[in-house]
Amino acid sequence: AATGFTPAPGQVWTQCHSYAFDLSVFEMWGALLHGGRLVVVPESVTGSPADLHALLVAEQVDVLAQTPSAVAMLSTQGLESTTLVVGGEACPAEVVDTWAPGRMMVNQYGPSETTMYVSMSAPLVPGSGPAPIGVPVPRAALFVLDGWLRPVPAGV
């Protein structure tokens, strides 16, 4: 993939999110369609950063998809080889600076109306500021429009 993140057979993914949240689709099918193993995380565990961290380490999770707010509450210790995919909200620079060193970390963007995500960033780099939304996925396009639905110039 152009992003540098490619699901692969044998990876261990988590299913942390409610089925009502579109990120759950990425979690489930990202693992299952690529020959991975899906760890279904109980709601009681997702609500406890310490318990979630312990599960991630014990299950040797390879791919973790989380909101930046949730991952900001987790320790990186023991998760050095875990690929992190953030989405669902803007990802602040502090989260990138904490989680990007030494690992694949990408940002997905897409309103629920797009049924998951429409863009993915290149691998994020510490010290580069807030995470960009990246480039459109194949067969998609992104446009920035003004209040009258007219295209705005680059950089606006």
Located regions from the model:
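Motif- and composition-driven signal specific to adenylation
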Residues: 1-154
